[in-house]
Every structure is written in structure tokens, then in C-alpha cells.
A protein has these predicted regions:
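Rossmann-like dinucleotide-binding domain that binds NAD(P)(H)
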Residues: 156-220, 225-231, 305
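N-terminal Rossmann-like dinucleotide-binding module
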Residues: 1-45
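Hydrophobic residues in well-ordered beta-strands that form the structural core
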Residues: 51, 89, 114-116, 145, ...
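NAD(P)-dinucleotide binding in Rossmann-like oxidoreductases
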Residues: 201-202, 216-285, 303
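C-terminal helix-rich "cap/oligomerization" subdomain common to oxidoreductases
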Residues: 63-66, 101, 112, 216, ...
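A contiguous active-site-proximal alpha/beta segment in oxidoreductase catalytic domains
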Residues: 71, 94-155
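Beta-loop-alpha module in the N-terminal Rossmann-like domain of NAD(P)-dependent dehydrogenases
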Residues: 15, 45-106
């Protein structure tokens, strides 16, 4: 199987290294608008760098992995669909709902599989919590508490194109909550704040946010995120039912010293520094699964339509943050012309 990879930045280089070790991948070719960067990565990994995207597809690909800049995702997905090549694309599908809708409709029409990179679906802890919930072991679900905390903030230049904290960061929680529960978010109430560097406010964004979500079965969830958690990268989820609970991410590398004098909690290693370190195994698994998708052996485990559903929740949270009012997710769907769209 020959795989192409477009975008050789940090996550692209990581995925390229991973793909070299995935069973069944016999060829890898990389491309980037920064041809020197692509050539350097190709030289490091002992693979080929294509001079451009057209030349990459001319080689004949069995699948393509898109890790380019967010603003290019939708265009690159459409190009892959034009070529009839199965696609893996890092989130988001597009910077906005309209662009995402366009990809959803096109992917459905042409039938070429597209997998979106919500890697938490492949994390062992989230999968175990989902299994415990759906087995009935936890009883009926009443509360979910999710947090995503970056150890250090991104560079100032990233903020204007990031989409904002809800769309860039919390969208992972919105996706995993829908996937884990099998339920839809019907309304949100969200707030945001800036306590750190001024470039967040200058970019019309926040560095810390919180949202209250209500699901269609009246389960409640809180989702918080911050760009400032110097103790370490911290991603957790509490799944609380009438008969039991599970916590994802509470391991011996969680940056959570106990305040209880009677408890001695010793870390086995330093806290996670980045999301790539925290979710290393999940990133590997999702690409292994993508090769199965590209081969036609399994359906896409995360379609553009599912990514759109998570984006609707993020859009509702952003609207709520700006207005200070609760927002029904249906209002966002309808306003986007997406009343019948999504998963």
C-alpha cells in the first residue's frame, strides 16, 4: 500500500514516522508547500518527497494523510476525492461550518472514504469507559466532566487562524462525549476568560473556557479548557452513572498532586508535556485503522458528518460565550442550512 502525506510540520512528521512502521504500508511519499521541509523529512526517513501534490497523485496512491495548515484542509480533501483516493485528515475538516458542509456533501456523493483525526476515539482509556457505560456497569448516566489543559500556550501567531478555544481545543471533548454516550447535545451555556497573555484577547479569543452541555436524554456535562496548565498537559474525563463511575486520564503521569495528607501519590514519570505525548498510542492506532479503511476492509470510524456534529456544538458554545446566553444546537444547525445534515 502506497500512502501520501501532505504537510510535514510537527504532526505531519510524527504521522510520517508512524506510517513507516504500519504493517502493509510499503511506500510513503511526502509533500509540502515548503518543499525544503518536505525534502528534509524525506531524507531523514528514507522516503520520497514529491515536488507537488499533482505529482504525488500521479504516482498512484492507495490513501492520503492530510496534516497541512487548517485553512487548506477542505481544498486538499476535495482534491483527494477528485482523484478517488481515500483520505485521512486531521481536524478540523474546514475552518467553518460552510466549508465542512461542502466536504460532508461531497464525500457522501462520491463514496470515497474520509476519516477525520479525532484521535481520542482510539485511546484505551476512553474506549474502556465507553464499554463500561454501554455494558450497564455504571447504571444510567447522569454527569460527565471533561477537561483539556495545555501545559503551555501556543505561539501568538497561531491564534488568529486557530478558530478559537472551543473550535480548536474543546471540540475534541465535544466529539468524544457524543461518541462515548451515543447521544446528541441539545443546548449549551458557555463562558470564556483571559488571565494570561494579551494576544488571546487581541485575536478575539480566550485562554480559558467552560461550557455546560445538556444532552437529549437530560445528561449534563461540563467541558473546561485552558492554555495555561504549567504542571503538565492534562486531559481527563469523569463518566458518572447511578451505579458507578470511570475516570479517563487519571494515571501516574497526571499532573494532580493530592491535597490530602493521608494519600501519597507518587508519579512513575514526569507529567505529559504535550498532546502528542499524551495520545501517542492513539495516534498510532488511528493510522493503523486508516490503512484498513483505505483498503476497503472497514468503514471510516469518524466521518466528516461526525466532525460536523462536533463543530455545531463548538459553534453553539462560541455563540453562547459572545452573547452570554444559552444556545440551542438546533439553532446553529438550522442557521447553517444544516437541519438535515450531520451524523
Amino acid at each position: 500500500m502506497k500512502i501520501g502525506l501532505i504537510g510535514t510540520g510537527r504532526i505531519g512528521a510524527f504521522h510520517a514516522q508512524t506510517l513507516r512502521g504500519v504493517p502493509g504500508v510499503t511506500g510513503l511519499v511526502v509533500a509540502d508547500v515548503d518543499t525544503a521541509r518536505a525534502a528534509a523529512l524525506a531524507d531523514t526517513l528514507g522516503v520520497r518527497a514529491a515536488p507537488g501534490i499533482a505529482e504525488m497523485y500521479a504516482d498512484g496512491l492507495d490513501g492520503v494523510v492530510i496534516t497541512a495548515a487548517t485553512s487548506a484542509h477542505a481544498t486538499l480533501i476535495h482534491q483527494a476525492l477528485d482523484a478517488g483516493v481515500p483520505v485521512f485528515c486531521e481536524k478540523p475538516v474546514a475552518p467553518d461550518v460552510a466549508g465542512t458542509l461542502g466536504v460532508v456533501e461531497r464525500a457522501r456523493a462520491c463514496g470515497v472514504p474520509v476519516q477525520i483525526g479525532f484521535q481520542r476515539r482510539f485511546d484505551a482509556g476512553y474506549r474502556a469507559a465507553r464499554e463500561a457505560l454501554h455494558s450497564g456497569e455504571l447504571g444510567w448516566l447522569h454527569t460527565l466532566r471533561a477537561c483539556t489543559s495545555d501545559r503551555t500556550p501556543p505561539p501568538a501567531g497561531y491564534i488568529p487562524t486557530s478558530g478559537g478555544l472551543f473550535r480548536d481545543c474543546s471540540i475534541h471533548d465535544f466529539d468524544i462525549l457524543r461518541w462515548l454516550t451515543g447521544r446528541e447535545v441539545v443546548s449549551v451555556y458557555a463562558q470564556g476568560a483571559n488571565r494570561g497573555a494579551s494576544f488571546f484577547a487581541d485575536g478575539d479569543d480566550v485562554d480559558t473556557c467552560a461550557a455546560l452541555l445538556r444532552f437529549d436524554d437530560d445528561t449534563l456535562a461540563t467541558v473546561t479548557a485552558t492554555r495555561y496548565n504549567g504542571a503538565g498537559h492534562d486531559v481527563r474525563l469523569e463518566v458518572c452513572g447511578s451505579e458507578g463511575a470511570r475516570v479517563v486520564g487519571l494515571d501516574d503521569r497526571a499532573p494532580l498532586p493530592s491535597a490530602e495528607a493521608r494519600l501519597s501519590w507518587r508519579r512513575a514519570a514526569a507529567p505529559y508535556a504535550t498532546f502528542m505525548e499524551r495520545f501517542h498510542d492513539a495516534y498510532v492506532t488511528e493510522l493503523e485503522v486508516f490503512t484498513e479503511v483505505a483498503a476497503g476492509r472497514v468503514p471510516s470510524p469518524c466521518s466528516p458528518a461526525e466532525a460536523l456534529d462536533a463543530l455545531y456544538v463548538a459553534e453553539a458554545c462560541e455563540r453562547s460565550r459572545r452573547t452570554g446566553l444559552p444556545v440551542a444546537v438546533a439553532e446553529v444547525r438550522t442557521g447553517a442550512g444544516g437541519a438535515a445534515q450531520g451524523g
